[in-house]
Amino acid sequence: LAELVLREDKDGWTVLTLNRPEKLNSLTVSLFKELRQHIIDLRDDDAVRCVVLRGAGKCFSAGHDLGDIAEGEDVPSAGWHSETLRLMEKLPKPVIAAVHGHCYTGALEVALAADFIVAADTARFGDTHAKWALTPVWGMSQRLPRRVGIATAKRLMFTADMIDANEAVRIGLAEYAVPLDQFDAEIEGLVARIIANSPFSNAANKQLLEATDMRPMDAGLQWEVMETAGIGPDMAERIAAFTKK
């Protein structure tokens, strides 16, 4: 059987590819099981300093497989999908969702669990839960308003509107958009800039930002000082290399 999530290790980073292109990478329990195992494997893999999540073929993912829903999925436990995405969100390294083509509903919930989204100009985003008389259980109600604001989240959820890459950038859902023919090169360049920096700092800063998100300013400032991860083991080497230039 074909792998439903491919792992490709590069020089200091890894690409995870949703791999059901004949089904527009629609999301099943089996696919999520493979994604979850990759996430667990990556958590303690110090050779990997950045992770890119993308889709094979025409799109990132058309969303949760409606056939699976209709047949009654055999989910390992209540909240298991959400827990899987939380594991990805808490990986101690940057995670980028590289989105081209469709990114709807469950797929958008997956992309929102990355640290940020970069879009190809072909990307289309939407939340269609309301179209199918469903409500989100993979994190949409929490991550979407944190990303775009509660009013915009309500508009997208109430209307089930599809938005293009430019609109996604305008509302803050995606960081920026690039032409599809430049997409791979852009992602590689972005990753290169990330992994050139200290993996210690990237992990510590990710944890700091998450721990203090939505805290009152004074509480956040206190946390930054009192809970600091301190100085990384590569600090002296990095400063010495810079001063020798």
Locate each region found by the language model.
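C-terminal alpha-helix plus adjacent terminal tail
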Residues: 1-11, 160-166, 181, 185, ...
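Terminal peptide-recognition signature
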Residues: 16, 20, 35, 53, ...
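Glycine- (often His-adjacent) and acidic-residue-rich active-site loop
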Residues: 40, 55-90, 103, 133, ...
